[in-house]
């Protein structure tokens, strides 16, 4: 089983950016924890981070060639990107949307997700555990 992990804009700044909201773990720390969990499931993970909406759309469109599912933190594009939503709808791979912070406890504009209606589920507010829970759920869905 192969899973693509997509990280949206500004997540390359994790560990430095607003640690009171996003915590102190770096993106490498998160990827390392996901890699360890992937090994438990005998799964290969691919990782991609971009601040560019188009690059993320390209990665989504190419995913069916090599991956069985997607774990995505679309970050700010959660609330704005019809392009990401349409790309995910077009390819038909199962995906889980994750967020480090609870987007529903934050500013009003962060409460809406264009992706959530298409996702297997959305997990938010648990920091690193949002990613780990999302990956476990995706593994279980694909296996069953």
UniProtKB/Swiss-Prot annotation:
Chain positions of site Transition state stabilizer: 17
Source species of the chain: Trichlorobacter lovleyi (strain ATCC BAA-1151 / DSM 17278 / SZ)
Taxonomic placement: Bacteria, Pseudomonadati, Thermodesulfobacteriota, Desulfuromonadia, Geobacterales
EC number: 4.2.1.10
Organism domain of life: Bacteria
Enzymatic reactions: 3-dehydroquinate = 3-dehydroshikimate + H2O
Pathway: Metabolic intermediate biosynthesis; chorismate biosynthesis; chorismate from D-erythrose 4-phosphate and phosphoenolpyruvate: step 3/7
InterPro entries: DHquinase_II (IPR001874), DHquinase_II_CS (IPR018509), DHquinase_II_sf (IPR036441)
Listed PROSITE patterns: DEHYDROQUINASE_II (PS01029)
GO molecular function: 3-dehydroquinate dehydratase activity
GO biological process: amino acid biosynthetic process; aromatic amino acid family biosynthetic process; chorismate biosynthetic process; quinate catabolic process
Broad class of enzyme this protein falls into: lyase
The UniProt record lists the keyword Ribosomal protein: no
Protein name: 3-dehydroquinate dehydratase
Binding of substrate, residues: 73, 79, 86, 100-101, 110
Active site annotation, chain numbering: 22, 99
Keywords for the protein's UniProt record, in alphabetical order: Amino-acid biosynthesis, Aromatic amino acid biosynthesis, Lyase
Coiled-coil segments: none
């Amino acid at each position: 089983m192969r899973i693509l992990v997509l990280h949206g804009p500004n997540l390359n700044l994790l560990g430095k950016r607003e640690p009171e909201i996003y915590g102190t773990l770096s993106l490498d720390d998160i990827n390392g924890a996901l890699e360890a969990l992937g090994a438990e499931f005998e799964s290969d993970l691919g990782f991609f981070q971009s601040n560019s909406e188009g690059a993320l759309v390209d990665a989504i469109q190419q995913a069916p060639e090599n991956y069985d599912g997607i774990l995505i933190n679309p970050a700010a594009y959660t609330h704005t990107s019809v392009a990401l939503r349409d790309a995910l709808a077009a390819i038909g791979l199962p995906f889980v949307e994750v967020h480090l912070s609870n987007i529903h406890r934050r500013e009003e504009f962060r409460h809406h997700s264009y992706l959530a209606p298409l996702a297997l589920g959305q997990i938010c507010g648990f920091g690193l555990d949002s990613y780990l829970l999302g990956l476990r759920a995706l593994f279980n869905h694909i296996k069953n």
